[in-house]
Amino acid sequence: MATTSMPLNKIDPRQRAWVEVSPDAIKANTLAIRSLLDEQCLLMAVVKADGYGHGSETVAEAALAGGATNLGVATLQEALELRKAGIVCPILVLGNLINPEDLDACIHWDLMPTLSSAREALLCNQIAESHDKEFCVHIKVDTGMTRLGCDLRLASELIQLVDNLKNLSLRGIYSHLALADVEANGQANSFTSKQKEKFETLLSSVMPRGKPLYRHLANSAGTLRDKGLHFDMVRVGLALYGYSPLKDLRNNFSLQPALAVRAKVTLLRDVPSDTGVSYGHTFITQRPSRLAVVGIGYADGISRALSGKMSVLIDGKFYPQVGSITMDQLVIDITESPQIQIGSVVTLLGVDGDSAITPYDWSEISGSIPWEILCSFKYRLPRVVI
């Protein structure tokens, strides 16, 4: 029978592995991004995917304290979690909502849906009529991403429809950049420039029907690279968390990483030369070695693709990870450092002393991208706000 003598909230979340999150860094990053914008240009903090793995409520509060005015999420559930946490600022649901019940929840909780079609507009108006309320919406237009958004050829017609529906209030028109993070700075005739031109052409054609409150196009890359992409509002995700998506301009901005992943050494092993390590024995010791087992694995978000290629930090010094990363554990070679003990803190991502490991490092090893890496840390890793 389970004992209840120790309250769960008394258990140290750092007993095995955890994620550290710095709201101060998020606030500082928001202020740094805010300084790049004209005074009248607003900043939407994109906090989808649980704030890119940092904790959406923590990120939202820090970003709003740093000058963000709006929040962007991908799903209705993400928006509802923020509302239930007491966050009252404008929230845009960036993903498509196709069920009447979802749109009903949107109007009840004062959330703004994204419209990509006439069907969605008519459904929103019908729901708003049933509540005898005005429904604030944004229209998304596809200028080259070929994902969500109204076909550009139908955009004027959709905007006119929304303008004519008495229970809808058009609060924004937006699009999304497809290549802003990969095109060279200042590249002539870039695809980003073409997207901007298409967006501006559309806006100029619909202005007689009334300018929407927000026109927005720029993501983090567009925000950092080109002021001409800012319009009335920018949508910032990755940069909010301390990372520039622009490889050629990575060090040009005062951004602070807001997250670290740490774990503890759980066992020490002294093994002879020619000892196979972990599944498949992909690593064989070439000398008598001291190995440390670390309590974190791919079920926590440490990709198996990093096996035998990554390093970790202990007290500011790098140590190689060896053998296959397993579901719950990985192994590092600490032969040169006998002072490491069970319980020593291992930094897998983040700053330790004068050294650091970044999502860029992991992405270059694994073929992933920083966005995916930050979103990969699972529920088993408690978030510790520092």
Curated annotation (Swiss-Prot):
SUPFAM superfamilies: Alanine racemase C-terminal domain-like, PLP-binding barrel. Gene3D superfamilies: Alanine racemase, Lyase, Ornithine Decarboxylase, Chain A, domain 1. GO terms for molecular function: alanine racemase activity; pyridoxal phosphate binding. The modification N6-(pyridoxal phosphate)lysine is found at residue 48. Pathway: Amino-acid biosynthesis; D-alanine biosynthesis; D-alanine from L-alanine: step 1/1. GO terms for cellular component: cytosol. GO terms for biological process: D-alanine biosynthetic process. Its EC number is 5.1.1.1. The active site is at residues 48, 279. Keywords: Isomerase, Pyridoxal phosphate. Substrate binds at residues 147, 327. Belongs to the alanine racemase family. Catalyzes the interconversion of L-alanine and D-alanine. May also act on other amino acids. This is Alanine racemase.
